[in-house]
């Protein structure tokens, strides 16, 4: 009996310091917004930062800026030899403009609802992600296609800032990704778009 009491006392003596320290231990898992403008070494290793007015966005390092591809493309256009297409454009927002949510909903309808007069290839999957960078809200619409578009993926990030709506279109092929680049990194690249406060 005496031995049991001694062991119990010893156990309590060891447990008390551990319990007192437990209140000082922070949780192992921290929920943070990884697209909130902080330094990201992995993303910096594969991307360069470009600007379109105050809009700050990333493109792949080996991308070449092209101009005048078609007369109806405005903004800045970048391409890689692997077929990754990056396009940033903007337009003014006025009282007659749809809200950000309605704009993204229309983009989804345009891509997923077949038109009776036009033969369309519809995506096999689509999704919407909400992004918040430094207090500026964006919506990312993602579309995955199958054959005959050869596993193409389109991402469209739409952001309202002051009186302008910005669009970042990213297009790539899932079976022809640039060497060492994953789909998750391309998604992170487009979602990292933010605004310079210079």
Model regions and ranges:
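Sec/Tat-exported extracytoplasmic proteins
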Residues: 67, 104, 108-119, 190-197
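A mature extracytoplasmic/lumenal domain signature
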Residues: 61-63, 82, 90-92, 104, ...
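Short amphipathic beta-strand and strand-loop transition segments with alternating hydrophobic
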Residues: 67, 88-91, 124-131
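A short acidic-to-branched-hydrophobic micro-motif
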Residues: 75-106
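Bacterial N-terminal signal peptides that target proteins for export
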Residues: 1-8
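N-terminal targeting sequences that direct proteins away from the cytosol to non-cytosolic compartments
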Residues: 19-85, 149-150, 162, 169-198
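Signature of long, low-cysteine stretches enriched in small and polar/charged residues
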Residues: 109-161
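Bacterial N-terminal signal peptides
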Residues: 9-17
